[in-house]
């Protein structure tokens, strides 16, 4: 019935109906979808809600993003002060507007607006247009539309986020921090009342100015709250005693470089981060302490990143030390690519274990090495001859690492680094060559900590599920509290390395007595059980340290952001002390559980660390299951001895029935030369029995020049340069490689033409030449310049 009458009315009054529809449509669309298009400050908070830092909005205003809610005290104060009928009207208050009209007419100017909080939101939206009756009419229309769209609490939220609070402070949240150093929900009644009266006259807040006027307005509001029985008398009297803010608080700068990162990725947003305020401030203190120490050596920049392994959340993010602009304080070193030094060595060790190329204790050569003109050196410029792979990693020896990479291949290792998502390893493998393992590449602290967190997470998940891996174990690190990392489903296949290989790598990295002879280990706390590694780039430009246990990864970089190197800047002396100080502020963690399902017990040669043969003294060891692909011991050989076992013999000089066959651990000549000096229990091959060596040594190799006890006088050429003496040796197999020594100094090796130039100071020397079978000849000479 009603619809029929309405239809008849529409047909009779088409013009009125059309105008009405147009007005309704205009009214409906009178407010834009986004009411405020202002730029907001980028804000970061700790996981506890503590303000860590903020970056001012593009228009120069401290305007925080809108909050989800308005605290009770401020809500009560602002309603009592500005619009006590707020919850009763529908956008405007006719009575207040009428009283305002009378006052303005009497004063012959605008002295009172009579606006509700809803109208004030509209006025803020319209950027405070000049006051007029027409403008007031527009505000009323839009205010009613606003009430249709939003709830009362949402309207209060808009007001609290956009109201001016003096100077360039906009919004309750920023005002709360700026004037009281508190979050809005932490405000007292007096503080909330102070902020409630400010938007009415924002110029009142200036340090040392207008304090009495502001105090009077605040106290009147507090009295009203007491009279309205919102607060009791005791609360009212105590609130009156609270002083006004005098000096504005500075915006905290607790994580300035994470703020930079957030501003790039979440500009104009308020991000609740995963940072722990306690740990962030403690790490800041540690960095400041070491910065004050290191700057005396003109080392100005330090970065520390701490990751929770279980969640991959960032716990602490210190992108640089508290230096100045002259020393690049704004550079976020956590994201900056830097030379790796030795920090990638554990990845090579894990890769070779996982492929079965080595076992943890496999001997790796540590001898003078030259490969296509590339001559790596150990940090201490010494050689051990041969070192177990795990000790080579623990001591960060360079020569064994290069030889391991040569065996594994640069291309394969490059692929592994790509699998680890080290973004700065981005040139062709051939551009790196063998230097890839010694600092020829670059990485950053973020990617490095991500890789080590992946390793720890792999072992943790495998041991907790007995034999499973997560497909997204190498998940990116996360600093957003409202986001969680998705590790994907569990599967049987590994991502990059098996858990057993990673666990064995951590076992090697757990060693504490490295590098040998270094006096910097007084800071080391042996009760902190972590796997860790240091690295130092060429020229002392970068000092790295990374540590990992079941729960945390800590990464440290020390150096100059400009790339300037400094003497004494090393990973072990500069970065490692910071690493351990940071670990001390976290709870102690148990060591990784052993992933027995990815290990097997096999017989290992006691001497060489390779799979034992029937000629080796063996012992049972837990190794990765891939060990079955590893090499058998290449160093044990059967030799023939006489009955006393003091001399070697052969069939030309000893009856077969009198020979004793024994197994002997024999290293190649150069390896043996250095190994026996470091290992006093190493037994060299016994000498040949008299009458046997002529059939062996002298038939195979002898000196051509010089003869025994020759006195050699070094001469000079026409340019005044000393001419070397050429030592010559003949060998029955010209393709045999010979290794030359002058006393204990290794000179090099020769093939085909066995000639070695020598220049030395005046004195008596022993020349030693050893072939590939370990047969050696010696000659004493005297040199005179």
Regions found by a protein language model. Give the residues of each.
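A penicillin-recognizing enzyme superfamily signal
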Residues: 273-294, 304-308, 317, 324-336, ...
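Short pre-catalytic segments that frame enzyme active sites
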Residues: 50-64, 174, 203-207, 259-267, ...
């Amino acid at each position: 019935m009603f619809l029929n009458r309405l239809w008849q009315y529409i047909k009779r009054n088409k013009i009125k109906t059309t105008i009405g529809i147009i007005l309704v449509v205009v009214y409906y669309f009178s407010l834009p979808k986004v009411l405020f298009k202002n730029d907001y400050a980028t804000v970061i908070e700790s996981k506890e809600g503590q303000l860590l830092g903020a970056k001012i909005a593009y228009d120069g205003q401290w305007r925080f993003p809108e909050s989800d809610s308005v605290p009770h005290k401020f809500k009560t104060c602002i309603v009592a002060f500005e619009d006590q009928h707020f919850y009763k009207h529908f956008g405007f208050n006719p009575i207040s507007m009428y009283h305002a009209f009378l006052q303005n007419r009497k004063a012959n100017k605008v002295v009172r607006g009579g606006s509700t909080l809803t109208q004030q939101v509209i006025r803020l939206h319209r950027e405070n247009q000049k006051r007029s009756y027409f403008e007031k009419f527009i505000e009323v229309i839009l205010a009613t539309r606003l009430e249709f769209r939003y709830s009362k609490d949402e309207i209060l939220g808009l007001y609290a986020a956009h109201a001016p609070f003096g100077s360039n402070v906009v919004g309750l949240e920023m005002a709360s921090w700026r004037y009281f150093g508190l979050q809005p929900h932490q405000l007292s009644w007096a503080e909330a009342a102070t902020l409630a009266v400010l938007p009415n006259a924002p110029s009142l807040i200036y340090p040392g100015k207008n304090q009495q006027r502001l105090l009077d307005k605040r106290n009147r509001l507090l009295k009203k709250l007491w009279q309205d029985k919102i607060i009791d008398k005791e609360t009212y009297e105590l609130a009156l005693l609270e002083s006004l803010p005098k000096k504005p608080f500075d915006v905290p700068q607790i994580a300035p470089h994470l703020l930079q990162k957030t501003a790039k990725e979440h500009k104009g947003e308020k991000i609740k981060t995963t940072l722990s305020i306690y740990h962030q401030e403690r790490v800041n203190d540690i960095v400041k302490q070491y910065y004050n120490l290191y700057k005396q050596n003109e080392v100005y920049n330090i970065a520390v990143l701490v990751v929770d392994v279980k969640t991959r959340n960032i716990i602490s993010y210190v992108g640089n030390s508290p230096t100045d602009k002259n020393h690049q304080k704004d550079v976020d070193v956590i994201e900056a690519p830097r030379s790796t030094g030795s920090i990638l060595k554990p990845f090579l060790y894990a890769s070779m274990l996982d492929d079965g190329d080595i076992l943890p204790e496999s001997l790796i050569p540590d001898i003078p090495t030259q490969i296509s003109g590339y001559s790596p050196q150990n940090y201490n410029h010494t050689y051990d001859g041969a070192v177990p792979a795990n000790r080579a990693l623990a001591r960060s020896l360079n020569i064994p690492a290069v030889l391991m990479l040569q065996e594994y291949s640069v291309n394969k290792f490059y692929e592994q680094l790509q699998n680890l998502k080290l973004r700065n390893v981005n040139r062709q493998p051939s551009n790196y060559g063998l230097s890839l393992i010694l600092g020829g590449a670059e990485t950053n602290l973020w990617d490095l900590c991500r890789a080590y967190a992946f390793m720890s997470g792999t072992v943790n998940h495998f041991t907790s599920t007995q034999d499973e891996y997560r497909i997204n174990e190498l998940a990116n690190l996360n600093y957003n509290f409202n986001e969680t990392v998705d590790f994907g489903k569990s599967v049987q296949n590994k991502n990059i390395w098996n858990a057993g290989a990673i666990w064995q790598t951590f076992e090697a990295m757990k060693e504490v007595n490295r590098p040998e002879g270094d006096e910097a280990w007084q800071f080391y706390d042996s009760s902190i059980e972590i796997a860790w590694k240091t690295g130092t780039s060429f020229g002392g430009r970068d000092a790295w340290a990374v540590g990992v246990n079941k729960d945390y990864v800590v990464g440290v970089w020390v150096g100059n952001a400009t790339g300037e190197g400094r003497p004494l800047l090393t990973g072990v002396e500069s970065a490692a002390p910071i690493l351990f100080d940071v670990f001390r502020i976290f709870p102690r963690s148990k060591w990784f559980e052993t992933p027995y399902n990815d290990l097997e017990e096999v017989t290992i040669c006691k001497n060489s660390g390779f799979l034992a043969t029937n000629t080796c003294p063996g012992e049972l060891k837990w190794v990765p299951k891939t060990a079955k692909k590893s090499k058998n011991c290449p160093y044990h050989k059967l030799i023939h001895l006489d009955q006393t076992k003091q001399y070697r013999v052969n069939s030309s000089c000893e009856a077969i029935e009198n020979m004793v066959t024994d197994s002997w651990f024999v290293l190649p000549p150069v390896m043996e030369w250095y190994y026996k000096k470091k290992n006093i229990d190493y037994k060299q091959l016994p000498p040949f029995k008299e009458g046997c060596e002529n059939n062996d040594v002298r038939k195979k190799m002898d000196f051509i020049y010089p003869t025994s006890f020759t006195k050699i006088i070094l001469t000079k050429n026409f340019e005044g340069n000393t001419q070397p003496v050429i030592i010559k040796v003949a060998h029955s197999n010209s393709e045999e490689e010979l290794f030359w020594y002058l006393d204990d100094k290794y000179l090099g090796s020769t093939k085909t033409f066995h000639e070695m130039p020598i220049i030395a100071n005046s004195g008596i020397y022993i020349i030693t030449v050893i072939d590939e079978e370990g047969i050696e000849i010696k000659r004493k000479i005297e040199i005179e310049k």
